[in-house]
Structures are given as structure tokens and as C-alpha cells.
């Protein structure tokens, strides 16, 4: 079985990590997920893939994985709601230093903060996301 794995390196046009030639904002993601949904893809996590590989689980007929590697707050506030509207979840890989180090003295106002906080990360997990 072939499983497409998408990797999103930066999702915010204002973020230094996002490639400037093709920013992946909420509108582009909506179109992207609409196409995947129209083609019949169903999202899976690495845990589901591992369970299938070990013979302990099944995969949907057309699995797809959506990976994100920067825990920016727009993943929770913009991208996850779009994904959820199509029944999708993602795999988020977190570099914890920004969460633990940057905000050690307290959280800045929401409009100044760029990274996820633990509460938002837990909420993504409750939505079915894999956090790695």
C-alpha cells in the first residue's frame, strides 16, 4: 500500500520558517484539504500506521498523513479547524524549547505570541492529532 505523507514546513505567511514563494495560509489549506477529501483520502497518524504494520489495526482504503513541523499557534487556530471540517487530523512535531523557554516568564498577549502553548497542544491531542 502506498500512503501519501505531506510535510508542511511552516504554515504562516508572516513566519520566518515559511517559504515565501508559496505561503500555506488557511485559504490554501482549505483548497488542499477539499481536494484530498474529494479524492476520498482519510487521514491517519503514525500510531495508526504502526498498528497496521504490526497487524493490530486496519487502515482506511485511501490513507493520507498530514505532518507539521513547527508548533505555531495558527496550526491550532486556523489550520486544525479547517482540517476538522473535513474529518482530518494531523501529526505535529514540536521543538519544545519555544514552549518551555520562551514563555518561562509568563505568556505574552495572544496577538504577540507565535508558538502553541501546552493547553492548545493538549487540545489538538484531544482532537485526535499525534504530537511527537
Regions found by a protein language model. Name each.
Residues 1-132:
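Catalytic alpha-helical scaffold of carbohydrate-active enzymes acting on polysaccharides/glycoconjugates
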Amino acid at each position: 500500500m502506498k500512503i501519501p505523507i505531506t510535510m508542511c514546513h511552516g504554515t504562516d505567511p508572516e513566519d520566518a520558517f515559511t517559504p515565501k514563494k508559496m505561503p500555506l495560509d488557511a485559504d490554501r489549506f482549505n483548497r488542499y484539504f477539499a481536494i484530498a477529501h474529494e479524492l476520498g483520502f482519510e487521514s491517519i497518524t503514525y500510531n495508526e500506521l504502526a498498528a497496521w504494520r504490526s497487524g493490530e489495526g486496519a487502515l482506511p482504503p485511501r490513507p493520507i498523513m498530514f505532518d507539521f513541523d513547527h508548533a505555531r499557534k495558527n496550526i491550532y487556530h486556523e489550520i486544525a479547524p479547517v482540517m476538522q471540517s473535513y474529518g482530518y487530523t494531523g501529526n505535529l512535531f514540536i521543538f519544545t524549547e519555544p514552549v518551555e523557554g520562551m514563555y518561562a516568564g509568563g505568556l505574552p498577549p495572544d496577538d504577540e505570541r507565535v508558538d502553541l502553548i501546552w493547553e492548545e497542544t493538549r487540545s489538538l491531542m484531544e482532537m485526535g492529532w499525534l504530537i511527537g
